[in-house]
Amino acid sequence: ASPDARVIFYMTWGHKYGNRKPVAEYPLSNGYEGMQERLKTSYLEMAYDNGAWCAPVGMAWRAVRSERPDCILYRPDCYHPAVPGSYLAANVIFTTILQRPYQTAFTAELPAEQAEYLQRTAQRTVLDNLVLLNIR
């Protein structure tokens, strides 16, 4: 293995309406915010405990949900990503790995303005939080 190799934990996003079937061993608040906060805390703890980085996909989803509630991140099942959600996640991963803004002309057939917004959100979420994400 390369001495420059890094383990990167992929912070997932909360379900659209939160955890609808809580289990005693893993208590979560019913809503999206509670589930997302628990996921964020857990992924960051794993990154710190293992000397790894964290790709904050869930944090980027939270930002988009807050700033652009009309952006459809979820498929109809309310768990899996629609194209904009996958596009956002991919941009978070690239920005995390590169540790610099990742820009591409590829839009996944999204409107150009939406693709640019998702790219900027991914960049901002990663680059404004390098210490929190254990990258620096």
Residue ranges and their predicted role:
Residues A1-I8, A52:
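A short helix->loop->beta-strand "cap" motif at the edges of active sites that frequently abuts
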Residues Y10-G14, V57-A60:
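Active-site-proximal beta-strand/loop segments in catalytic clefts of secreted hydrolases
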Residues R20-P22, Y26-A122:
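Catalytic His-Asp segment of secreted/periplasmic serine-dependent ester chemistry enzymes
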